[in-house]
């Protein structure tokens, strides 16, 4: 069956059919009405307008600001005299579907900025939008009696907008500025087919069950306390054990790959951040303090709490004369950093103000970039395979504003491509998306329910070696500038643990699980046997618990299973007499018996994992 074309793709830009017709644009790649990323961009943008049209009919006094698409959906910022709440979404959605059935053509026309100012003279939100539009002409899209300022792209008719779902209502400051008034933000999503929408909603339902904030509380892994501060996680014993297991695993993996452990201070003088450029380009994301000078006649020194670990590593490289024979020099640190995030974007462990990165910096010659990146990619492979993640990569290339010669940028970018090609990796290209100081590879992982998460980055940097004037002595006894590769594979322990918690739904594999097993003695006389087993495992750095309260056996078993540990071990007379254990295996969903020695050996083997 022939699919409808809803837009065109020309030079990686999506142009709707209305614009193409008005501007006489021909050719291009057709965007069909399906669930491709390009089609969903158009469908969701149009669904935002359909939602606004529905709200306008239900709340005639409504005024609208902007309604962009976002990952997996769209939103519209607006204000009404009668507050809109989550309870109203069902009614708005019903109105949207009724409007979609009317099959309104979606048309586009242009007017001058002056005409637009006059047209929307009684709408302060539209005036705010006009303030952001450059040029003397604006475009307006119209469907039925509803019209709004917009650049597009849009579908040709509302008949393409039946599969919509409104999700939640939130608050948002006008223009994202907390000094401005608070608007209402309504979120939704849309798909080309009913099946795709239902599949997505099912995924959201599953995601809610796996929410790391919920599981973190249930499993007593971490907590937040407003008195302590927003975005500052507090690790409880189970969470600290989980994190410690992950840190030990990654630490030994770095050592085996010839990385050298280092440690930098939490505070660095602002002078350092000025040299690096962070003081001028990143200051709003940093925290600063002052420390009094030893000389009372001099003013206090300003210090910045580090938002990243790289400056101390640069200093470590530069603190003595380096030879080309020392390169590549790989330094790593599990460094805690602080970054100021607005309270509205904080989200459990996924977005915090204090976090610890698996940070490494590789100092090398330009001709070593490719080989070093290959080694990092192989390291990435070993980690992602161990945790059961698929992942994809994207190279971001030179932006308009950048430092370094064309030649070195070309060589560095080509080195990244060659490294990926040599390992037969597929990758995307984000043209102009690199940092001003070098190209990079972004690593996005896919979890058990199909969501994608940005984690690691491999970043080539020509900037900091130049700013801090670090060099090595080459084979001709000349001073040469090294290339610096920033590299974080999991990104941060906090974020990665949040993702792991949701990926495994709290059922962590034995090698990182905080508690490997829970012993449930049937009676008091069986507790001593459980304690001996616990002690034997503890001597191998394996943590277990004993549930020996006065609760009934069934309740203790249920409570143990709620902890989502891999093994619940029941101990009664028979087990004590025969030196065995009765195991409830969560992963296999089986019950079986083993000798005490077999069980201890099994747990040890499952816990001894290398990357």
Curated annotation (Swiss-Prot):
InterPro entries: aa-tRNA-synt_IIb (IPR002314), aa-tRNA-synth_II (IPR006195), aa-tRNA-synth_II/BPL/LPL (IPR045864), Anticodon-bd (IPR004154), Anticodon-bd_dom_sf (IPR036621), Thr-tRNA-ligase_IIa (IPR002320), Thr/Ala-tRNA-synth_IIc_edit (IPR018163), ThrRS_anticodon (IPR047246). Its cofactor is Zn(2+). GO terms for cellular component: cytosol. It catalyses: tRNA(Thr) + L-threonine + ATP = L-threonyl-tRNA(Thr) + AMP + diphosphate + H(+). Zn(2+) binds at residues 310, 361, 486. Signal peptide: none annotated. The keyword Cytoplasm applies. Disulfide bonds: none annotated. The keyword Cell membrane does not apply. Binds 1 zinc ion per subunit. Keywords: Aminoacyl-tRNA synthetase, ATP-binding, Cytoplasm, Ligase, Metal-binding, Nucleotide-binding, Protein biosynthesis, RNA-binding, tRNA-binding, Zinc. It is found in: Cytoplasm. Its EC number is 6.1.1.3. Pfam families: HGTP_anticodon, tRNA-synt_2b, tRNA_SAD. GO terms for molecular function: ATP binding; metal ion binding; threonine-tRNA ligase activity; tRNA binding. GO terms for biological process: threonyl-tRNA aminoacylation. Belongs to the class-II aminoacyl-tRNA synthetase family. Homodimer. PANTHER family: THREONINE--TRNA LIGASE, CHLOROPLASTIC_MITOCHONDRIAL 2, THREONINE-TRNA LIGASE. This is Threonine--tRNA ligase. The lineage of its organism: Bacteria, Pseudomonadati, Campylobacterota, Epsilonproteobacteria, Nautiliales. The gene is thrS.
